Regions:
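Short N-terminal helix/helix-N-cap motif within the alpha/beta-hydrolase-1
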Residues: 100, 106, 124, 177, ...
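N-terminal secretory signal peptides and thylakoid transit peptides that target proteins
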Residues: 1-16
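Phosphate-binding glycine-rich loop
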Residues: 79-118
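Short hydrophobic alpha-helical segments of the AMP-binding
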Residues: 84, 133, 192
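N-terminal "arm"/small-domain region of PLP-dependent enzymes with the aminotransferase-like
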Residues: 15-71
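PLP-dependent aminotransferase-like
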Residues: 111-169
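Active-site pre-lysine segment of PLP-dependent enzymes
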Residues: 153-162, 178-198, 202-215
Length: 215
């Protein structure tokens, strides 16, 4: 107990020494409050949420679907896949829907871990889905972002090992918001050995002026 009190005294003295102006940096960020009404409060950037809520058309569609919500939506899912394929100019067989992108990321991780090995990921980036990787037999190779907080694609190429199964790229990157140019990313993918999965997460691509790699 005495050690804890001594530690608290030292910390308190250190904070006082910083001055009143700098004490503001110790206040709790508003984004820690998950129950805030985003209509009246700042946008919660950390959660990839729509601050405006569902559009009027979406609300009508949801209301109309309540009476059939006790049934599996096979038909609706097929229609959604067809529309996604049409928008991205790809075959519908290349579309997989899931309960959020994390489920799909998990599936790719499971597939990559089938033969064990390693995977390459930037630091920092969105890595919540990678936590089970070691239990699945995949070792993590972290590549720091460059001085501009962008992906160091050359360093990622150099980090490839003989047992590398997967390379993950979040574009635009979460949490830095930086983006890899389309041509640079295409060239990078072409340089990666064909036996390695390059997983490009474009969760935020619609917030940029850059065209998605899907079309």
């Amino acid at each position: 107990m005495s050690n804890r009190r001594n530690w608290l005294k030292k910390v308190s003295l250190g904070i006082v020494g910083l001055g009143v102006g700098q004490l503001e940096t110790f206040s709790n960020p508003i984004t820690d409050n998950y129950d805030l009404n985003t209509v009246d409060f700042p946008i919660l950037l950390r959660s990839n949420e729509n601050p405006y809520g569902p559009s009027p058309l979406a609300r009508v569609a949801m209301a109309e679907s309540v009476n059939i919500s006790n049934r599996y939506g096979w038909k609706t899912t097929s229609e959604l896949i067809s529309e996604i394929a049409k928008r991205n100019i790809v075959n519908s067989n290349n579309i997989l829907t899931a309960a959020g992108s994390t489920e799909i990321l998990d599936l790719v991780l499971l597939f990559a871990a089938h033969e064990k090995g390693s995977f390459i990921i930037a630091n920092p980036t969105y890595d919540y889905w990678t936590y089970p990787s070691e239990k699945l037999g995949l070792s993590r190779i972290s590549v720091p972002l460059d001085a501009n907080k962008k992906y160091d694609l050359s360093a990622m190429l150099n980090a490839i090992k003989s047992d590398t199964r997967l390379i993950y790229i979040c574009n635009p990157n979460n949490p830095t918001g930086t983006i890899c140019k389309r041509d640079e990313l295409v060239n990078f993918i072409n340089e990666v050995p064909k036996n390695i999965i390059v997983l490009v997460d474009e969760a935020y691509i619609d917030f940029t002026r850059q065209q998605s790699l899907t079309n």
